[in-house]
């Protein structure tokens, strides 16, 4: 039996691709040059790109594709529809008009320099931009933290220098998250050379980088909350000075003469370790520093402290230990609870500016144990800005 012969069906015509428009870039401020390209338009003909009330001509290729350059008009705002058309064929895409970022205020040349630490560190440029606008000046130093497992922070230091600031690197000899007892990081293990290869790597990298960097090694050593404090983690009296000198010598041997060594205890308090036994000596330190916070009534154990009450006793001890050595307030901020943070900000800058050997302060602009940020309230931000402006004018 013959099989039935089925009629041959014609293949359906290929669907014509819909016209498409592409923008590069897709966002930017007015005046931006934008490449508009398209496919699926009428072939080998002229067309028009419409941008608001402006028009730009183009010619399509034999494939129906085109590419042309346009400029975003000065009056454009927000989402801007860009349409390309050839006779009856048209397609659109949306360009987002952004506002140009305001120019950042410059770094002040005042004798009392302003620095900052932020949650995101040196690579979080938006945070640092915000601080510059809040303060009315850009920070002259940016404080950030590295533990003893991290590589030399060249990328972060480059970001700080690009802002016209000096990196203030807090180098912590422990493993973050490991707790107070970390025998591998005991001070005598550092002095014995267990970390010499790592310390040398840092020194060589800093020397090769070659630009000014402040190195704050093993800070707040007079407290009991870090494993490099004496009396914890197996550390004995005298171990801290030996470890500091060893790290200093290893780094210095690499030729890292661009490093400024910052010795930075906490403000002395009842029960803290005496500073005299922790000071490595003037030949091992370039800057002496203090960390101190006004906790106000934000904690059960704390009370409001004026800037002078907070810092004057420690500054007096630093002057006695290291006469003529510059003094830095390496971390400070105030809580809101318990008093007027706005007034505290004003008093801080006024008090520090009156101390001829205090070369700067670094504000801890973080929301952590409490809201330490400059703009924890509008009143705080306004007072901070005004205080810096007054010291610039003096």
Give residue ranges: language-model regions:
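Boundary/entry segment of secreted carbohydrate-active catalytic domains
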Residues: 99-150
């Amino acid at each position: 039996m013959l099989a039935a012969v089925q009629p041959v069906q014609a293949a359906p015509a290929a669907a014509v691709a819909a016209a498409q428009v592409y923008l590069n870039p897709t966002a930017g401020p007015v005046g931006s040059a934008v490449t508009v390209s398209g496919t699926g338009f009428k072939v080998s003909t002229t067309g028009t790109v419409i941008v608001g009330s402006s028009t730009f001509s183009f010619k399509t290729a034999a494939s129906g594709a085109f590419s042309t350059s346009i400029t975003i008009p000065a009056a454009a705002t927000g989402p801007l529809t860009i349409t390309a058309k050839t006779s009856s064929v048209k397609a659109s895409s949306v360009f987002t008009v952004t506002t140009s970022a305001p120019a950042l205020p410059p770094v002040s040349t005042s004798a009392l320099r302003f620095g900052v630490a932020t949650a995101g560190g040196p690579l979080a440029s938006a945070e640092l931009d915000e601080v510059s606008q809040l303060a009315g000046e850009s920070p002259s130093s940016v404080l950030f933290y590295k533990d003893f497992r991290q590589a030399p922070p060249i990328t972060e230091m480059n970001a700080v220098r690009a802002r016209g600031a000096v990196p203030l690197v807090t180098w912590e000899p422990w493993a973050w998250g490991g707790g107070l007892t970390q025998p591998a990081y005991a001070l005598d293990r550092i002095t014995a050379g267990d970390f010499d290869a790592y310390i040398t790597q840092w020194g060589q990298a800093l020397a090769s980088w070659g630009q000014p960097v402040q190195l704050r090694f093993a800070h707040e050593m007079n407290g009991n909350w870090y494993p490099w404090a004496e009396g914890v983690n197996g550390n004995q009296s005298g171990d801290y000075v030996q470890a500091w000198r060893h790290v200093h010598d290893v780094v210095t041997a690499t030729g890292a003469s661009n490093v400024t060594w910052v010795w930075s205890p906490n403000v002395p308090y009842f029960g803290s370790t005496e500073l005299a036994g922790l000071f490595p000596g003037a030949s091992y330190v370039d800057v002496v520093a203090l960390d101190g916070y006004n906790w106000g009534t934000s904690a059960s154990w704390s009370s409001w402290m004026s800037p002078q009450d907070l810092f004057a006793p420690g500054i007096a001890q630093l002057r006695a230990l290291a006469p003529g050595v510059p003094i830095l307030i390496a971390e400070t901020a105030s809580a809101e609870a318990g008093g007027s943070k706005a007034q505290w900000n004003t008093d801080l800058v006024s008090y520090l500016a009156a101390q001829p050997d205090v070369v700067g302060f670094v504000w801890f602009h973080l929301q952590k144990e409490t809201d330490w940020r400059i703009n924890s309230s509008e009143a705080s931000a306004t007072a901070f800005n005004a205080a810096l402006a007054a010291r610039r004018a003096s």
